[in-house]
């Protein structure tokens, strides 16, 4: 039995490369305004923006600047509860809060009125701000559907057509064909076709509670579910099929890196990485000496323009893992359910005549 255990350890060493150094953690002990981070975003100039439930944070590579409504540098900011971030075609940072839509010009925050069909201003929880290919900003709301902000108009109006019947929006994705995929708060998947019609039935999604959707460079779609793992809709296929290797993680969000690795953020079980080419899944390859990332609630994942991976978390702040890797491999708690040696300190190693490794 011990021999089997040690073989498993050696096998894990051989197939699970790790980053060569611990990353950097930002929290309330290290510059961040709140540990309740809801999204991390990089703008076109390379600045990292971090939305939290107690203020907005901007990182220039050396220092974080905090913006809160009670501070002098935050003129016009009407809420510290920031849900989501994007950037418009003019370079303004667009923010969705728990009650408003804002644009940060670099010197002040400007409220963007959200109007109902009768022209009455709405106060609503903004779930996502998403830049479309035509430069419009699609605004997902909890209760009033999808609103649109045109580039030269300083207000939002409801997206017209059949899509108006969808009121509680969770996630949006515009695909390479110009279709808009919509996940509603009840976990249902819909698609606004280019002719404005809504498709709401997709083979393979029956009974799923859907959390996120992404498309890779090859036209394949990946669908994240709450408790049944990840499904893939391959280019040219007509059905979503489950990826068995990933398992039934409680997934909140997914992200596809530039080299087409699928980063999977879960609710309480950290990050795992799936390689579609090999089918290999790495459980919690990111490492911090300060917190156990394998037990984190992940709210967003991005890759910055230097290849660093950023992860926002509820209760633990934001973590950045540099892209430098080496051939040194790891076994320990951050491998999640592939860890076979526990979380205790290692005090000794011994190799016997049969090339078995004993771990003490």
Where are these regions (language model features)?
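Carboxylate-rich, polar loop motifs that coordinate divalent cations or form catalytic acidic clusters
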Residues: 1-360
